[in-house]
């Protein structure tokens, strides 16, 4: 089966590579000529465990190709996936200009039936706009060519995307015709054979499902952070509370971890977009507005704990603060909306010297903020002469540090754990002053 995927960002490249690995012939398209040149030279522009090897494997097998020219591949494909960016506008709504540009290009060059599938996260009603954009171009050409639009939102977790794609909890597909359903069933046949759930529904429901799923997960995070902050005030332990409520099968144990706020390319953007969609339709999403407020506040919690430990914000001036973790989560270099960016600004504004280490995201941080902080060679280098250590990202290598070595390296034995990964008793035995979230 021949398919095209427009957009070689995170979603497009992972999806295209994984489809190729199931046996499809995939052409990935991007208007960025430099990115396509890099891909054709075997350079992967994003970090995702296992992706480099999988791209090389499928390129070598002849199932995965890269080009800048969408028009040149339309005659040969049955499906065109649109996986381009939908950045938020200033008002929080999703900007569809790239999605609609793809539709326009398809309309300008279409010669036979295809299914045009939106994989980007888009508001309800986008498929109608895609259909109209294609029809407008066909009308300008004076031709009538049958096509279908569909929605197939992605549910990939950065750092675990290949496994998520190849072994999904579910595949959601929104279609408007039996023909489109038949074509997409053929594409997803390898998943059906392996008994993975492919759920077909109408297009508006598929578009809503992605926003609803991410907003539900964001809600669980903010709820637990709210509970954690209350636990600190009443003498409860949020870890015990999590165990107590997570054992209820109606609630479950996942996404019940307190911390220093969520970030990334999805949750913040999707919550804002769903709030905006509701506003545009005369409804106010009060729960999600609270979720957003709680998260923004939570990103400052570690700084507030640091100020409290030193007595005042003025007392932070000239202090050296070690930071472990820069990416918004482990196994990625993505720093979009990361708590680390908020923390760095607050620390620098307070006159602190920041020494940071992250296994993957150092280059990305330098690209974003330059040399305003010190980038350290490892986790132990970061704590050298530090007055405090802040843990922001729960990378595996941070979970069992040598506290004896760290204590000797630091000026003050102060640890503030933003992800609750350290053992309280172990730190107390090593005579550290330890603060975490929710106890």
Language model region names:
Residues 1-439:
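Structural/interface elements that position substrates and couple domains in central-metabolism enzymes
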């Amino acid at each position: 089966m021949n398919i095209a995927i427009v957009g070689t960002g995170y979603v497009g490249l992972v999806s295209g590579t994984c489809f190729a690995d199931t046996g499809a012939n995939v052409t990935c398209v991007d208007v960025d000529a430099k990115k396509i040149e890099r891909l054709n030279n075997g350079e992967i522009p994003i970090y995702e465990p296992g992706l480099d090897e999988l791209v090389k494997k499928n390129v070598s097998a002849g199932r995965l190709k890269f080009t800048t020219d969408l028009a040149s591949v339309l005659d040969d494909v049955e499906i065109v996936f649109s996986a381009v960016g939908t950045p938020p506008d200033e008002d929080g709504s999703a900007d569809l200009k790239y999605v609609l540009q793809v539709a326009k290009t398809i309309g300008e060059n279409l010669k036979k039936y295809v299914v045009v599938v939106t994989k980007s996260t888009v508001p309800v009603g986008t498929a109608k706009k895609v259909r109209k954009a294609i029809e407008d171009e066909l009308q300008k050409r004076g031709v009538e060519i049958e096509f279908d639009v569909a929605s197939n939102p992605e549910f990939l977790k950065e750092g675990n995307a290949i496994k998520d794609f190849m072994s999904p909890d579910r595949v959601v597909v929104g279609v408007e015709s039996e023909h489109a359903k038949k074509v997409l069933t053929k594409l997803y046949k390898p998943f059906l054979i392996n008994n993975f759930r492919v759920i077909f529904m109408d297009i508006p429901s598929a578009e809503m499902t992605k926003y609803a799923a991410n907003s539900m997960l964001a809600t669980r995070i903010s709820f637990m952070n709210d509970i954690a902050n209350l636990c600190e005030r009443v003498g409860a332990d949020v870890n015990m509370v999590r165990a107590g409520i997570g054992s209820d099968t109606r609630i479950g144990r996942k996404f019940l971890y307190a911390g220093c706020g969520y970030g990334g390319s999805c949750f913040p953007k999707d919550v804002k977009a769903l709030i905006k969609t509701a506003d545009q339709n005369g409804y106010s999403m009060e729960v999600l507005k609270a979720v957003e407020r709680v998260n923004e506040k939570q990103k400052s919690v570690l700084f507030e704990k640091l100020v409290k430990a030193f007595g005042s914000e003025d007392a932070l001036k000239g202090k050296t603060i070690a930071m472990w973790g820069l990416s918004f989560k482990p196994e990625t270099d993505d720093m979009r909306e990361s708590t680390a960016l908020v923390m760095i600004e607050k620390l620098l504004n307070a006159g602190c010297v920041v020494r940071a280490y992250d296994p993957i995201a150092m280059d990305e941080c330098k690209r974003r903020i330059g040399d305003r902080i010190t980038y350290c060679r490892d986790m132990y280098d970061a704590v050298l002469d530090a007055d405090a250590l802040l843990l922001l990202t729960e990378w595996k290598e941070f979970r069992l540090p040598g506290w004896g070595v760290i204590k000797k390296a630091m000026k003050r034995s102060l640890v503030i754990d933003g992800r609750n990964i350290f053992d309280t008793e172990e730190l107390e035995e090593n005579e550290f002053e330890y603060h975490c979230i929710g106890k």
